[in-house]
Amino acid sequence: MTPMYTDAHVHILDTIEELNSQNIENPILNTFDKEIFFCASANEAGRFEIQEKICRENSEHFILSFGIHPQCPIENEIPYLEKLLTEKRIAAIGECGFDLFDEHYKNTLEAQKKVWNVQLNLAQKSNLPIVVHCRKGMHLIFDDVKSLKKINAVIFHGWAGSVTEARSFLKKGVNAYFCIGKGLLRGQKAQLETAANLEKDRILTETDAPYMSLKEEKFSLPTDIKKVFSVLAELRAQTEGLSNYDGKTYKNYAEELKDSIFENFKKAYNIRFDGN
């Protein structure tokens, strides 16, 4: 299969709803792009059902994830997650993890831990990867390294840690991948450092659309993945000493990087095509 742009974490239904609320014409056309292979995430049963239907009607290149989000650690969604696993309708569990960004979320820590542990166990039993959401809770993720090592792949959405922390997970035996997104376009230090220096076989790209917008934007779009990749490619080219590259050399470099990230996406989500 020809290498594609890959969006490792996006909210398709949320994006369409946001476009509708802003009275944007053709929300479907503005959401789907034939050059992008994506993983669409949901954390409520009803929304998953709608999103799945929309994706099936408008794209051939997608997978789905479902998880109990740490900002809304509701145990009532666990039976539905188990149902999806039984029916093999999802490629990953998540987003799940910890969010201690403010006092409100800190007060739900015990509930977050409970649904996190349930999802870790389900990931091990189903042999599916997990998509991790983590804000101000990296120490809690490190506490579960023994469990994470038993999981097929651990995909860190919105990676905000250092390269040292990323490599620490890898050295401890976690099959981890780290998502670079629009934080790169914002100039976020952690994203810049990781994008420039982390081994390329551990990097994924994402938009988190319609979220993670820039200051001048009202929302993000899945097609922003092309901007993310472009900046990532330029940054890595400079880091690798290709600052004086000619157009052809850079084009070849960018295509090789795109191919590498596509391969990472397939490995992280265990995607197999006929003949592969």
Explain the meaning of each model-derived region.
Residues 1-276:
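Mid-domain alpha/beta scaffold segments of enzyme catalytic cores
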